[in-house]
Amino acid sequence: MTVRKNQATLTADEKRRFVAAVLELKRSGRYDEFVTTHNAFIIGDTDAGERTGHRSPSFLPWHRRYLLEFERALQSVDASVALPYWDWSADRTARASLWAPDFLGGTGRSLDGRVMDGPFAASAGNWPINVRVDGRAYLRRSLGTAVRELPTRAEVESVLGMATYDTAPWNSASDGFRNHLEGWRGVNLHNRVHVWVGGQMATGMSPNDPVFWLHHAYVDKLWAEWQRRHPGSGYLPAAGTPDVVDLNDRMKPWNDTSPADLLDHTAHYTFDTD
């Protein structure tokens, strides 16, 4: 069984293996397919129309399946690799270990945001940004520039305390746990982290930055934590809702899985705190 660990506890060998598997997916072209898929859903998901991956109840199960697909791709390269998670409520600064040169590399230079160190820096030659909106083919970051602070544990706790999964109108205006975790309302959790990292992470092509996977692995963990705290509160909406994915509806682009199929993460992996 795959165990997803806090990135802060990874050994040097675990970091090396994760990075090597990510680089191999990039070299083979498979990595960029994940970027293309994510961007297509960011563009297509709207508050007033069909919405699947974002600003909708299926934000959490959609990304759970998306991360599972990526994790399986990594494991096809190296069976020992699991997705680590980044607890940004604890590792809150640009000096945190995940930004070190032996793992993800650090922030970008002030001139153009170009990441200058680590395995994904343009100078290393292994990480061209191919799925992009402009001519800049290098990984960019500006940690803590567009927004200064990452979410705190107290802010996370305030969202975990919400007893209702989601509410009408089932979009970025909704009340409830999902929308506050996604970050369109309230203390702005998930969305704020994308903006804090900056560069490609602040765009629909956010998976171009490998930190995307660690960020979403933690968002996924928070969903599991919420489920444990609110065993009587299930996924909503249940049925008959236009434009969104109900509990037993199939999710695009896979069309073979529903939110109901993904409610129990332990069927696929566990966290180091489970």
Curated annotation (Swiss-Prot):
Signal sequence coordinates: none
The record gives the effect of mutating residue 194 to Q as: Loss of activity
Q: What is the effect of changing residue 54 to Q?
A: Loss of activity
Task: Note the effect listed for residue 63 to N.
Answer: Loss of activity
In the record, biological process GO terms are: melanin biosynthetic process
For this protein, the Enzyme Commission number is: 1.14.18.1
Please give the superkingdom of this protein's source. Bacteria
Asked if the keyword Oxidoreductase belongs to this entry, the reply reads yes
- Family the UniProt entry places it in: Belongs to the tyrosinase family.
Q: What is this protein called?
A: Tyrosinase
